[in-house]
């Protein structure tokens, strides 16, 4: 099973197994994240019975041996996840109704295709309140100062996220959307307001504005360009975004590759989300 606390050591097969569980497992609602703008439900998703070991909590991240998630996953057949039903989406003036879940899944697809891995495994599936997005729950490292992290200029994963946000045109990158895990890898969450056709980039990660893109970012953008043109990504996005949204994503990738600099803040749109936390 895919281990979010040690993403670098896992394989494509591990991640695919997690995607399969998210898609086909039995979803049980445990609670609600009450501060979220849209209906955001904390769930467990289960298949079969624990493979071995004593009876334990069904949530992988609450395993008895919480410092060894690989051991925990061998003992259990459940993971924690977030389920956001389309029916619980709050209407927005600048995004079509009922499209936020699809945008979250599209953000994961783009992150995975480029090799950034900044979005946890995410799928579209049916659930107790109808279709919606289902995303692996990430237990972030609570010892990390998120405000200090958001201001760093020497964190490769944070810079990857800034480039990713430019590609998907993220209109809501807040500090609280940063999910660092103990091994140093960085995830992000809440990508429902991405992929607008108009330039809506709104983020707390402007520290590289106008700076030359690092080589790793250029290589990731080239991979993404290829996947959009000739790979399965373009076809996969067609069920989640409009053709115009996909085309403007291609244009953003091409523009970044042409100029090879981080974008500047918009002049006709708030550059930082509110509240920024």
Predicted feature residues:
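Phosphate/dinucleotide-binding and metal-coordinating scaffold of catalytic cores
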Residues: 1-277
């Amino acid at each position: 099973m895919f281990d979010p606390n040690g993403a670098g050591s896992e394989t494509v097969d591990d991640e695919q197994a997690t995607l399969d569980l998210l898609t086909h497992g039995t979803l049980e609602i445990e609670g609600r994240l009450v501060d979220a703008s849209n209906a955001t439900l904390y769930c467990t998703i289960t298949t079969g019975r624990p493979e071995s070991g004593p009876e334990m909590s069904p949530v992988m991240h609450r395993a008895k041996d919480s410092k060894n998630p690989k051991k925990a996953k061998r003992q259990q057949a459940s993971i924690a996840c977030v389920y956001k039903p389309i029916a619980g989406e709050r209407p927005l003036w600048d995004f079509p109704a009922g499209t936020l879940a699809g945008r979250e899944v599209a953000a994961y697809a783009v992150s995975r295709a480029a090799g950034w891995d900044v979005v946890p495994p995410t799928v579209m599936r049916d659930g107790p309140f109808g279709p919606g997005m289902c995303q692996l729950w990430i237990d972030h490292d609570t010892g990390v100062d998120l405000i200090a992290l958001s201001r760093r200029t020497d964190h490769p994963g944070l810079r990857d996220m800034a480039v990713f946000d430019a590609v998907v045109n993220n209109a809501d990158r807040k500090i609280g959307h940063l999910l660092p895990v103990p091994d140093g890898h960085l995830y992000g969450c809440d990508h429902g307001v991405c992929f607008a056709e108009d330039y809506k980039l709104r983020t707390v990660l402007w520290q590289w504005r106008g700076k030359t893109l690092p080589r790793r970012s250029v290589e990731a953008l080239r991979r993404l360009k290829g996947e959009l043109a000739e790979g399965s990504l373009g076809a996969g996005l067609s069920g989640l975004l409009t053709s115009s949204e996909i085309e403007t994503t291609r244009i953003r990738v091409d523009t970044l590759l042409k100029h090879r600099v981080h974008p500047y803040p918009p002049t006709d749109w708030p550059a930082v989300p509110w509240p920024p936390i």
